[in-house]
């Protein structure tokens, strides 16, 4: 690879690091081209899966201000640069690794810090953002309904008391 090509590759990878909300570093030794294509399809639009030379990736990470990943860049390494929701991409990679034992998750990077294998797996086990928001909305709706009931209870009791007094007064006047 010519020096100019290397500089361009480093700049491209550094840009991907800067634009990514998270990255997942994997080892792909033993996967076929068809397997890699299948993994890229499973990631969809939320992430790009890139295979690059470790030396170029290390330089790009340093250029992008990413620290703590150098020890992950050994052997055949590929990186998933996540532009969307990190949970969705981590789920897709974990599911693919479960089916294809040749894919090994090495770690990742998110919100300014390196992630261990266990942390990437925990992110993959989280529910998606939409599901969590729906659960939160459901919990809030239930609590708001209870609060409304508590606030309306005294007013309805006063209304029932007034109606009972009115009926009693009407009954006394009729008698």
From Swiss-Prot:
The keyword rRNA-binding applies. GO terms for molecular function: large ribosomal subunit rRNA binding; structural constituent of ribosome. It comes from the Bacteria. The keyword Nucleus does not apply. Keywords: Ribonucleoprotein, Ribosomal protein, RNA-binding, rRNA-binding. GO terms for cellular component: large ribosomal subunit. One of its GO terms (biological process) is translation. CDD domains: Ribosomal_L10. InterPro entries: Ribosomal_uL10, Ribosomal_uL10-like_sf, Ribosomal_uL10_bac, Ribosomal_uL10_bac_type, Ribosomal_uL10_CS_bac. PROSITE patterns: RIBOSOMAL_L10. HAMAP family: Ribosomal_uL10 (MF_00362). Belongs to the universal ribosomal protein uL10 family. Forms part of the ribosomal stalk, playing a central role in the interaction of the ribosome with GTP-bound translation factors. Part of the ribosomal stalk of the 50S ribosomal subunit. The N-terminus interacts with L11 and the large rRNA to form the base of the stalk. The C-terminus forms an elongated spine to which L12 dimers bind in a sequential fashion forming a multimeric L10(L12)X complex. This is Large ribosomal subunit protein uL10. It comes from Mycobacterium sp. (strain JLS).
């Amino acid at each position: 690879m010519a020096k100019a090509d290397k500089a361009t590759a480093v700049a491209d990878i550094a840009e991907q690091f800067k634009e990514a909300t998270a990255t997942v570093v994997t080892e792909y030794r033993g996967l076929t081209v068809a397997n890699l294509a299948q993994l890229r399809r499973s990631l969809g639009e939320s992430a790009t899966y890139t295979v690059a030379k470790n030396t170029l990736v290390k330089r790009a990470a340093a250029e992008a201000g990413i620290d703590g990943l150098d020890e992950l860049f050994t052997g055949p390494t590929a990186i998933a640069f996540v532009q969307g929701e990190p949970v969705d991409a981590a789920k897709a990679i974990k599911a693919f690794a479960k089916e294809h034992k040749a894919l090994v998750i090495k770690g990742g990077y998110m919100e300014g810090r390196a992630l261990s294998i266990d942390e990437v797996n925990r992110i993959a086990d989280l529910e998606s953002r939409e599901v969590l928001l729906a659960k939160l909305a459901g919990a809030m709706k239930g609590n708001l309904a209870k609060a409304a009931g508590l606030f309306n209870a005294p007013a309805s009791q006063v209304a029932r008391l007034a109606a009972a007094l009115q009926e009693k007064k009407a009954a006394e006047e009729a008698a």
